[in-house]
Amino acid sequence: MLRVGNLTVDVQGSRVLRGISFEVKAGELVYLVGRNGAGKTTSLRTIMGFRKPAAGSIITFESVNLIGLRPYRIARLGIGFAPEESEVFGELTVAENIALPTWTHPQTREAEARIERVYRVFPQLERYRARGGHALSGGERKMVSIARALALGPKLLLLDEPTEGLSPVIVPAIIQGLANIRTFGHAVFIAESNIHHVPDFADRLYVIERGEIVFAGAPELAARDPAVARIVGGTAPGGSGAAIEAPPAV
C-alpha cells in the first residue's frame, strides 16, 4: 500500500527528516507519533508532494513512486489528506463542505454512495447536513474535514493531528470514526503528538524524534520501550494509561 524508504528532507537548509522508513499495509491503521517539530507533518506533506525530498523513495499502489508527482496527481492515485488546519467554509453547509471534492467529478450512483457512507463514519454529522460551516464547533469541523478527505473514496487516508486542540469529550468520537473508517477498507496513516490518543486497535506505531524513527512496532510494545517513555512521557499504549479501546464497528 505505502512503503517509505530512507526518506530525507531538508527545509531551509536544515535536515528535518533523516533517512526514515515506514510502511502502511492495505486496511491498516498506523500512527506516527512525536513531539512538535519532530518531523511528522513534513513526512505527510512530502508523501503528498508538497515537499521534495533530498533522498529516498515513496512507493505505493503497484510500485508507483510518488516522488516528483504533483499533489493533484497523487490525490488521483487514491490518497486522501486532511491537514491539521483544514478549512471548513462557513458559507457552505456541512453537506456541501463534505461533497466539495466531488463537484468536478461525474455524479454517479457510486459517487453518491461514497458520500452517504461518510455519514456512517461520523453519524453525528447526519443531523447537521444543512447547518452552515460557520456554526460548527472545533470537533465538528474536524469531523467535516476528515469526512471531506473521504469523499472520493481514497485507498489511503493521511491525517495530520486529528485530535489536536480538541476537548477530551470529543476525542473518543474521533477515535470511533477512525475505527469506522477502517471497516470500509481504507488504510489510514496518522501523525499524532499525543501518544495517549493512539487506540489499542492501531496496527502499528512509529515514534519519530528529531527526524529519526526511534521505535517501530505494535503499540503495546511501546509501553516497555524506555526511549518512547523519554520522548512522549507517561504511559505508552498498552500500559495502564491506555484508556481508549477498540469501539464496536458500524
Regions found by a protein language model. Give the residues of each.
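Helix-to-loop junction immediately C-terminal to a conserved catalytic motif
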Residues: 48
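C-terminal boundary and immediately downstream tail of ABC-type ATPase nucleotide-binding domains
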Residues: 120, 204-212, 216, 221-250
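Catalytic Walker B motif of ABC-type/P-loop ATPase nucleotide-binding domains
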Residues: 157-161
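Conserved ABC ATPase signature
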Residues: 132-136, 140
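Conserved ABC transporter NBD signature motif
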Residues: 56-65, 77, 110-115
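ABC ATPase C-loop
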Residues: 149-150
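The feature captures the beta-strand-to-loop junction immediately N-terminal to the Walker
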Residues: 33-35
